[in-house]
Amino acid sequence: MTQTKEPLTKAESAELEQEIELSQYINTDDIDDDDIDVEDLEQEVAATEGKEKKVRKIRKDAVKKKPYTEDSIRIYLQEIGRIRLLRAEEEIELARQIADLLELELIRDNLTLQLERQPSELEWGKQVWKLETAKQRLVGDKKKEPKKKDIDSYLANPDNELSLENEWSQQPNKNFAAFRRRLFLDRRAKDKMVQSNLRLVVSIAKKYMNRGLSFQDLIQEGSLGLIRAAEKFDHEKGYKFSTYATWWIRQAITRAIADQSRTIRLPVHLYETISRIKKTTKLLSQEMRRKPTEEEIAEKMEMTIEKLRFIAKSAQLPISLETPIGKEEDSRLGDFIEADGETPEDEVSKNLLREDLENVLDTLSPRERDVLRLRYGLDDGRMKTLEEIGQIFNVTRERIRQIEAKALRKLRHPNRNSILKEYIR
């Protein structure tokens, strides 16, 4: 007896349609090669008759097994996948609105400097209206764009300022409402330009995985680059926005990797050189079917071997001294590394020697003490000749030699040298 297939509910049908729609332009395998492609698996099961319940079970099991962050990425990809791509004429119109938004924000920034505080939205809108009304009055029948200094000069005139105030006061609500609508439309245009190109960010971010930043961080940094591209895009140049935005997205991601992926930050130019060395090494390995030598890589990169070695050493990641060593993991890497600097015991001994030496020198006369300090560099570490010391004291080098000899004889007395003998090993 043939079993009747259970029909899908409206919500379940919509959910399956979203999965099928998403799979047309997003390959989640690129996110992690070790993961199962749940979309493909679901579609295969859904293609067989009467398996809708199994589809839902597979989806729930997959979500349970995946970490929260990966599931968040999946939801994010689904959301941006529903956003329609822009047509060329739409890009141009949105770019014009974004340019208008930047002009409005520039007026706000100038007003902030003028008022020495953040202006209210009403003050901002009023200033925009004044500037544009002044521009219209200056243009008149000339149909020539007035310069900024001409507009500023017009507004500086008290009569013109009073005239603008009176005209604004006749319809303040209407003028302010028009400004707010204009601001809303411009901001929405910027959001639409950015949201419609978020898939481009994901596509570029995938190429920079496993370089020290998580996939979520790469998407976030790339999105900041996309926002910057939307603000800088000039539609009059004739190229597509996606072509222009690609450079800004890549720049934002590579700079973030250089700044955040390493404990010890490397300059951006050095990080870019490291990336080129890696690409060159991979290319030479494919061509020669063996690991290239340092000389071959340096020749291909047109740099010296010394510079190549320096960059390669800079690219090494630091290792924590707390890294466990051995099967039992009861030892740490720091236990096996000899310290290059002085031990605490040596430092204490040196401080005690310095104190005792000062006490012994204080038993000499001031001139004898100063001569020994200069002769043996006790103050600055530089030993001076008898001639140099003689010039300082304005006496002959022979006199300095006599003072030195007398001071050393005093120091050899048992009452003095017994203290210092303890430091001789």
Curated annotation (Swiss-Prot):
<comment type="subunit">
    <text>Interacts transiently with the RNA polymerase catalytic core.</text>
</comment>
<dbReference type="GO" id="GO:0003677">
    <property type="term" value="F:DNA binding"/>
</dbReference>
<dbReference type="InterPro" id="IPR050239">
    <property type="entry name" value="Sigma-70_RNA_pol_init_factors"/>
</dbReference>
<feature type="short sequence motif" description="Interaction with polymerase core subunit RpoC">
    <location>
        <begin position="217"/>
        <end position="220"/>
    </location>
</feature>
<feature type="DNA-binding region" description="H-T-H motif">
    <location>
        <begin position="386"/>
        <end position="405"/>
    </location>
</feature>
<keyword id="KW-0238">DNA-binding</keyword>
<dbReference type="GO" id="GO:0005737">
    <property type="term" value="C:cytoplasm"/>
</dbReference>
<dbReference type="Pfam" id="PF00140">
    <property type="entry name" value="Sigma70_r1_2"/>
</dbReference>
<dbReference type="InterPro" id="IPR013325">
    <property type="entry name" value="RNA_pol_sigma_r2"/>
</dbReference>
<dbReference type="InterPro" id="IPR017848">
    <property type="entry name" value="RNA_pol_sigma_RpoD/SigA_cyanob"/>
</dbReference>
<keyword id="KW-0963">Cytoplasm</keyword>
<dbReference type="InterPro" id="IPR012760">
    <property type="entry name" value="RNA_pol_sigma_RpoD_C"/>
</dbReference>
<dbReference type="Pfam" id="PF04545">
    <property type="entry name" value="Sigma70_r4"/>
</dbReference>
<dbReference type="InterPro" id="IPR014284">
    <property type="entry name" value="RNA_pol_sigma-70_dom"/>
</dbReference>
<comment type="function">
    <text>Sigma factors are initiation factors that promote the attachment of RNA polymerase to specific initiation sites and are then released. This sigma factor is the primary sigma factor during exponential growth.</text>
</comment>
<dbReference type="InterPro" id="IPR009042">
    <property type="entry name" value="RNA_pol_sigma70_r1_2"/>
</dbReference>
<dbReference type="InterPro" id="IPR007627">
    <property type="entry name" value="RNA_pol_sigma70_r2"/>
</dbReference>
<dbReference type="InterPro" id="IPR013324">
    <property type="entry name" value="RNA_pol_sigma_r3/r4-like"/>
</dbReference>
<dbReference type="InterPro" id="IPR028630">
    <property type="entry name" value="Sigma70_RpoD"/>
</dbReference>
<dbReference type="InterPro" id="IPR036388">
    <property type="entry name" value="WH-like_DNA-bd_sf"/>
</dbReference>
<keyword id="KW-0805">Transcription regulation</keyword>
<keyword id="KW-0804">Transcription</keyword>
<comment type="similarity">
    <text>Belongs to the sigma-70 factor family. RpoD/SigA subfamily.</text>
</comment>
<dbReference type="InterPro" id="IPR000943">
    <property type="entry name" value="RNA_pol_sigma70"/>
</dbReference>
<protein>
    <recommendedName>
        <fullName>RNA polymerase sigma factor SigA</fullName>
    </recommendedName>
</protein>
<dbReference type="InterPro" id="IPR007624">
    <property type="entry name" value="RNA_pol_sigma70_r3"/>
</dbReference>
<feature type="region of interest" description="Sigma-70 factor domain-3">
    <location>
        <begin position="272"/>
        <end position="347"/>
    </location>
</feature>
<dbReference type="Pfam" id="PF04542">
    <property type="entry name" value="Sigma70_r2"/>
</dbReference>
<dbReference type="GO" id="GO:0016987">
    <property type="term" value="F:sigma factor activity"/>
</dbReference>
<feature type="region of interest" description="Sigma-70 factor domain-4">
    <location>
        <begin position="360"/>
        <end position="413"/>
    </location>
</feature>
<keyword id="KW-0731">Sigma factor</keyword>
<dbReference type="GO" id="GO:0006352">
    <property type="term" value="P:DNA-templated transcription initiation"/>
</dbReference>
<feature type="region of interest" description="Sigma-70 factor domain-2">
    <location>
        <begin position="193"/>
        <end position="263"/>
    </location>
</feature>
<dbReference type="Pfam" id="PF04539">
    <property type="entry name" value="Sigma70_r3"/>
</dbReference>
<dbReference type="InterPro" id="IPR007630">
    <property type="entry name" value="RNA_pol_sigma70_r4"/>
</dbReference>
